[in-house]
């Protein structure tokens, strides 16, 4: 009975996960932003499942704190202080009580730090990534006839890196279509009708440039789907 309930709970979490990513992808494509609390219900559901069914107390506690810290990322100093403290305390607690989750926690921590400056990812992207990693803890990746267990989070991160390359080339292509320039930015001087949602305009050395705003949550969705297929069919993408 407990196993059946666990399987049902896992299915519900995955349905909410993919539904949330679909909503986020649509919003990101249309507005290049997502609701700041979009991934909160998924995190709450995953927290309940991971604590009540899988007894993962340490990583659940610190992952939740790490996720909540993202709501204060606008205050760089406060965010850096609280996040760094959470990461260190989490490393100690998880190493002692749930060492099998060390890789997953390390990846969550790394992505949470990448939000500083928003150079690679926006806050919404990081919330999506952290919620994907936390809500899929119960999906281990079995290799070598079940003798090796690789966390879903590790394979997801590899796939995320691959789709990030695809996202970069998509950005090149979109910018090239508008400006005829190959690269991450193009001069905006002779370009008319620039969509401010799709393209970001900025100044550099007294010149005006544009950059394509990549709707990255859809690529996070792609990475999640690819990894999930790999888990179900045991194919190490």
Model-flagged regions — what are they?
Residues 1-237:
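A membrane-topology feature that recognizes alpha-helical transmembrane segments
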């Amino acid at each position: 009975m407990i196993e059946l309930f666990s399987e049902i709970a896992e299915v519900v979490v995955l349905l909410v996960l993919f539904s949330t990513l679909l909503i986020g992808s649509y919003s990101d494509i249309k507005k290049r932003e997502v609701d700041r609390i979009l991934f909160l219900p998924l995190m709450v559901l995953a927290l309940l499942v991971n604590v009540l069914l899988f007894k993962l107390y340490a990583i659940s506690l610190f992952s939740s704190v790490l996720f909540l810290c993202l709501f204060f990322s606008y205050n760089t100093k406060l965010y850096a202080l609280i996040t760094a403290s959470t990461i260190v305390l989490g490393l100690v607690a998880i190493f002692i009580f749930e060492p099998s989750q060390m890789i997953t926690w390390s990846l969550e921590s790394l992505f949470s730090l990448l939000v500083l400056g928003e150079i690679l990812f926006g806050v919404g992207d990081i919330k999506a990534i952290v919620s994907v990693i936390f809500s899929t803890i119960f999906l281990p990746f079995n290799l070598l006839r079940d003798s090796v267990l690789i966390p879903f989070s590790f394979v997801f991160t590899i796939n995320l890196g691959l789709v990030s390359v695809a996202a970069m080339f998509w950005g090149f292509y979109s910018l090239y279509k508008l400006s005829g320039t190959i690269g991450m930015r193009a001069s905006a001087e002779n370009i008319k009708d620039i969509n401010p949602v799709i393209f970001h305009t900025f100044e550099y050395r007294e010149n005006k440039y544009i950059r394509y705003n990549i709707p990255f949550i859809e690529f996070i969705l792609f990475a999640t789907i690819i990894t999930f297929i790999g888990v179900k069919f045991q194919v190490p993408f």
